[in-house]
């Protein structure tokens, strides 16, 4: 199959129509209704295997373990998480709910890491009882709570420490996490991170296993990863000088994807070369650790498409508006981050036109793209919004009392419904009316 769209290996235009994994997108829209999320099983497999292939050198050259811990925040649909678990993928969870899904997905406990800057006691209990690989500790108060909770349970909790390296990830400020001004991590320069680890070593119910770092999301430049890796390994050397040995280095996630189809960005191989080459420079100073990464977007984003049907077209003095039945409640990224997503008409026409694509919500920010060149759009056409497999359905909501959409999985075994559309009854299922209003 010829790759027609950068980053999207399993789609093509055939006989004037858009196909995903060999399935006609227009027919999928007709069968399952719109708006509709379509996830490509084959693309997820391709993306995961690119990580494994790129980082196999780590295990070959160091004899240490390499773990991909999928960031469930990107898309925690149970079919997606089970697919990745079957491939051998671990889990990066940030809530009790995500841990619950990871266990339902049969992810081995020793491949689960628990992130987040405000873990509750209930979540810590869940993690300890699940015997997860590590809590990535974000504060001294959290460390104290983990130790106290483990004591109450009569167990020992494995902990790694999330450090803040003050690295500029060169990404959108709302998804930057590794600068001093960000809320995440323990500061290294001031000595807080070292203090926390030394405190942990004096505690009876925690076991220090590693160092963690995550500097941001949608990084399209390798240099911040190199700086992050260097600063983490410098800290590992400092720990060694204090007589502290660690088993795991977790460098988080963040590798970007090509939302713009005319812009090449770093690959998993580029990331692997940068990280491995940097870490190996320290092999004479410290024993090489197990290596953990937490990709989310780069595993599932390019596997997802949001199909929306055109219901109305409106000409204004400024633009030609195309109104589709998908909205910002279904996919928040353009409204929240002013994010770009490639959009096409699923039916190829002989004529092009410039249009703006919007949803039907009562918000001026409910716009998927402005002044885009598409094949001529008519009422009834189906548009495909690309690269929505991450932070699409996971950020969907019920604004304007709209139900979240269906999701299907395309695979070599067929097309499977993996999330049902919410009904009007679902919208009020958790509401309770007091007796005096009945």
UniProtKB/Swiss-Prot annotation:
CDD domains in alphabetical order: PLPDE_III_DapDC
Catalytic function, reaction form: meso-2,6-diaminopimelate + H(+) = L-lysine + CO2
Residues annotated as signal peptide: none
Positions of post-translational N6-(pyridoxal phosphate)lysine modification: 73
Entry annotation: catalytic residues: 362
Amino-acid positions noted as binding pyridoxal 5'-phosphate in the UniProt annotation, renumbered to this chain: 217, 254, 294-297, 391
GO molecular function terms noted in the UniProt entry: diaminopimelate decarboxylase activity; pyridoxal phosphate binding
Pathway membership: Amino-acid biosynthesis; L-lysine biosynthesis via DAP pathway; L-lysine from DL-2,6-diaminopimelate: step 1/1
Activity regulation info: Competitively inhibited by the substrate analog azelaic acid in vitro but not in vivo.
GO annotation terms (biological process): lysine biosynthetic process via diaminopimelate
Residues at which substrate binds: 297, 333, 337, 363, 391
Domain of life: Archaea
Cofactor: pyridoxal 5'-phosphate
EC number: 4.1.1.20
Enzyme class: lyase
Keywords, in A-Z order: Amino-acid biosynthesis, Decarboxylase, Lyase, Lysine biosynthesis, Pyridoxal phosphate
Matches recorded under NCBIfam families: lysA
Function summary: Specifically catalyzes the decarboxylation of meso-diaminopimelate (meso-DAP) to L-lysine.
Subunit structure: Homodimer.
Family membership: Belongs to the Orn/Lys/Arg decarboxylase class-II family. LysA subfamily.
Name this polypeptide is given: Diaminopimelate decarboxylase
Native organism: Methanocaldococcus jannaschii (strain ATCC 43067 / DSM 2661 / JAL-1 / JCM 10045 / NBRC 100440)
Gene, per the UniProt record: lysA
């Amino acid at each position: 199959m010829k790759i027609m769209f950068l980053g999207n290996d399993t789609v093509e235009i055939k006989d004037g129509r858009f196909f995903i994994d060999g399935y006609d997108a227009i027919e999928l829209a007709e069968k399952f209704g719109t708006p509709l999320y379509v996830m490509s099983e084959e693309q997820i497999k391709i993306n995961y295997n690119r990580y494994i292939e790129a980082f196999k050198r780590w295990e070959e050259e160091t004899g240490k373990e390499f773990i991909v811990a999928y960031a469930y925040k990107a898309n925690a649909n149970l079919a997606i998480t089970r697919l990745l678990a079957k491939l051998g993928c671990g889990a990066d969870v940030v809530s009790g709910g995500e841990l619950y899904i990871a266990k339902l997905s049969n992810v081995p406990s020793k491949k689960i890491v628990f992130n987040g800057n405000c873990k509750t006691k209930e979540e810590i209990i869940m993690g300890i009882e699940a015997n997860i690989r590590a809590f990535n500790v974000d504060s001294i108060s959290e460390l104290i709570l983990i130790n106290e909770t483990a004591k109450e349970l009569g167990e020992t909790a494995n902990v790694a420490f999330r450090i803040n390296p003050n690295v500029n990830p060169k990404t959108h400020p709302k998804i930057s996490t590794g600068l001093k001004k960000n809320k995440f991590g323990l500061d290294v320069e001031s000595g807080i991170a070292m203090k926390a680890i030394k405190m942990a070593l004096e505690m009876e119910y925690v076991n220090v296993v590693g160092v963690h770092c995550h500097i941001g999301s949608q990084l399209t430049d390798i240099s911040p990863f190199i700086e992050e890796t260097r600063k983490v390994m410098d800290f590992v050397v400092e720990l060694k000088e204090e007589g502290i040995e660690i088993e795991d280095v977790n460098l988080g996630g963040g590798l970007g994807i090509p939302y713009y189809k005319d812009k090449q960005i770093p690959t998993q191989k580029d990331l692997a070369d940068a990280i491995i080459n940097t870490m190996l420079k320290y092999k004479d100073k410290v024993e090489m650790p197990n290596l953990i990464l937490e990709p989310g977007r780069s595993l599932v984003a390019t596997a997802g498409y949001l199909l929306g049907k055109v219901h109305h077209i409106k000409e204004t003095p400024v633009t030609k508006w195309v109104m589709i039945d998908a909205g910002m409640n279904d996919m928040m990224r353009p409204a929240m981050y002013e994010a770009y997503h490639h959009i096409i008409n699923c039916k190829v026409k002989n004529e092009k036109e410039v249009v703006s694509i919007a949803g039907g919500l009562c918000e001026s920010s409910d716009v998927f793209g402005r002044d885009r060149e598409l094949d001529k759009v008519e009422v009834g056409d189906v548009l495909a919004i690309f690269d929505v497999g991450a932070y699409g359905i996971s950020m969907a909501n019920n604004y304007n009392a709209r139900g979240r959409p269906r999701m299907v999985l395309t695979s070599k075994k067929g097309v499977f419904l993996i999330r049902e559309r919410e009904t009007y009854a679902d919208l009020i299922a958790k509401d309770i009316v007091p007796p005096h209003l009945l």
